[in-house]
């Protein structure tokens, strides 16, 4: 669907933009060459090369955008292998083991307090899970939106004045691709933090630590987009 939108809806618009840019380039070149009085053969050759490059970029727009995300996917896949091998933890297993070892030593009052804390933390975790899901699906939708309009900014790359539009668009694409890497790093840090809970001797501390680390993870995921754009200077 995204490719059909890009090729059937946006490419005709991009074709009009390229036509307007090439006409503007021709008029500018003629004016710079004293109204055709100082025009040589290299003038037409340079103009023809620029037009061919612009059309070729437009025809390969979808392939170029997908190649950028293929590179990003390769980076994320390699990062996932490194992170999963060095920082893997099962939160449920860790907390269950702590509960089984400490519940028998607690009184009624402590159990009631622990039950209330558990319900509060469980509610917070569900809210954080929803927010994390929003971040991940929001990034996926943003990628689809970026790809669907790719021909329009690519059509401006051949012009010196309008080329900044296409350059910023490509930077934004690279930022989206590298955002996945930052997300994996955040998850790896979260796993390392949660792994430290295994040595905690207090259930109350463990519960609130998991909640705090999940809040940190959620906040970090929200910041990955702006961080990726700032690293690549995308606007």
Residue ranges and their predicted role:
Residues 1-17:
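Binding/recognition "hotspot" determinant
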Residues 15, 19-31, 183-198:
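Juxtamembrane "helix exit" motif at the C-terminal ends of alpha-helical transmembrane segments
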Residues 17-55, 149-163:
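Hydrophobic transmembrane alpha-helix segments characteristic of membrane transport
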Residues 51-149, 183-232:
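Non-cytosolic segments of integral membrane proteins
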Residues 154-171, 199, 230-231:
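Alpha-helical transmembrane segments
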Residues 169-177, 215, 219:
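Transmembrane helix-bundle signature of multi-pass membrane transporters/permeases
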Residues 176-184:
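Hydrophobic alpha-helical membrane segments
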């Amino acid at each position: 669907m995204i490719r059909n939108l890009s090729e059937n809806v946006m490419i005709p618009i991009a074709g009009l933009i390229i036509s307007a840019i090439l006409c503007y380039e021709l008029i500018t070149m003629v004016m710079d060459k004293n109204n055709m009085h100082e025009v040589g053969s290299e003038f037409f050759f340079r103009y023809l090369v620029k037009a061919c490059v612009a059309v070729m970029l437009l025809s390969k727009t979808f392939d170029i955008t997908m190649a950028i995300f293929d590179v990003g996917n390769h980076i994320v896949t390699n990062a996932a292998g490194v992170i999963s091998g060095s920082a893997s933890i099962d939160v449920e297993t860790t907390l269950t083991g702590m509960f089984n070892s400490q519940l028998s030593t607690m009184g009624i009052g402590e159990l009631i307090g622990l039950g209330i804390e558990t319900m509060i933390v469980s509610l917070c975790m569900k809210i954080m899970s929803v927010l994390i899901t929003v971040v991940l699906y929001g990034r996926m939708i943003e990628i689809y939106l970026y790809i669907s309009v790719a021909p329009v900014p690519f059509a401006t790359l051949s012009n010196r004045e309008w080329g900044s539009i296409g350059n910023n668009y490509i930077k934004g694409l690279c930022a989206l691709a590298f955002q996945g890497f930052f997300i994996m790093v955040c998850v790896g840090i979260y796993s390392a933090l949660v792994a430290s809970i295994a040595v905690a001797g207090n259930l109350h501390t463990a519960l609130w630590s998991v909640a705090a680390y999940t809040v940190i993870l959620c906040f970090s995921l929200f910041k990955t987009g702006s961080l990726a754009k700032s690293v690549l200077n995308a606007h």
